[in-house]
């Protein structure tokens, strides 16, 4: 269980405030909807999952879209902002939404078939720990789809956060965590990189 100071960062406070208007934000149309479509498209070649986790789930939009594709799966979400968790719980009643961070997921080992993390990893305090945690909760043969900025600092405002994860960094972090990259390509925009990996 993360300590309370994990939830006191500027990023988390920003998302607490944004949770009230997040569902209708221009960012949904400009970035998030495109990224979510790309994530689901990457997953089309995979076996239907029994369980799906979204790390940094926000208000649960990707979970709701995934549930239309795989209605029989079990859905889980994790987000550090309590406001986002509350909205996700209200709008995604079939899912179990936890308050938590990527670096300390509140889930058992080898418990999830498919894990998404979209436009979230640049907010993680420790990307290596986040990838290790994802590998820990992923079942053998399961898949992880990470979509986020693929350049260290593609936009000036990103310097307020941890920066993106370039392809070489992802290869190193994933390999160290025991994940094998199957596909990697840009999606939505040239500076957004999608990585599909297996355990």
PLM features per residue range, with description:
Residues 6-7, 26, 145-195:
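C-terminal alpha-helical "lid/dimerization" subdomain adjacent to the S-adenosyl-L-methionine
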Residues 53-55, 59-104:
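Class I SAM-dependent methyltransferase SAM/SAH-binding core
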Residues 103-114:
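A short acidic, Gly/Pro-enriched loop at the edge of an enzyme's catalytic core
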Residues 114-126:
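A short SAM/SAH-binding and catalytic strip from SAM-dependent methyltransferases
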Residues 125-129, 154:
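Short N-terminal helix/helix-N-cap motif within the alpha/beta-hydrolase-1
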